[in-house]
Regions:
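DNA major-groove recognition helix of helix-turn-helix/homeodomain DNA-binding modules
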Residues: 44-59
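Recognition helix of helix-turn-helix/homeodomain-like DNA-binding domains
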Residues: 25-40
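The alpha-helix within a helix-turn-helix
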Residues: 9, 20, 50
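DNA-binding alpha-helical recognition surfaces that contact promoter or target DNA
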Residues: 7, 21, 32, 62
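Residue at a beta-strand N-cap/secondary-structure junction
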Residues: 13, 40-43
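A short, Lys/Arg-rich alpha-helix, primarily the initiator
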Residues: 1-15
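Residues in the helix-turn-helix
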Residues: 18, 29, 59
Length: 62
C-alpha cells in the first residue's frame, strides 16, 4: 500500500513532508507506514490522502 503512496508522491512532485503539512497527517505516521511499523492506515487517513491526490480509497487497496 505504501508503494501506491510513493507513486502518487512522485507523480505529483510532492514529498511526504509536504503531504503531512497539507493534510494534517502527522509525518511520524507516514514514516511508520513507510518503515512497515504500521501496515495499513486507518480509513480516515486513507480518505484524506485519496481526496488530496484525487484518487479513490480503493486505489490504495489494489
Amino acid at each position: 500500500m505504501y508503494k501506491k503512496f510513493e507513486e502518487l508522491l512522485e507523480r505529483n512532485h510532492k514529498t511526504a513532508y509536504q503531504v503531512s503539512k497539507d493534510t494534517g497527517i502527522a509525518q511520524s505516521i507516514l514514516s511508520e507506514w513507510k518503515s512497515g511499523r504500521i501496515k495499513m492506515l486507518g480509513a480516515d487517513k486513507l480518505k484524506i490522502l485519496a481526496e488530496y491526490f484525487g484518487v479513490s480509497i480503493e486505489y490504495f487497496l489494489e
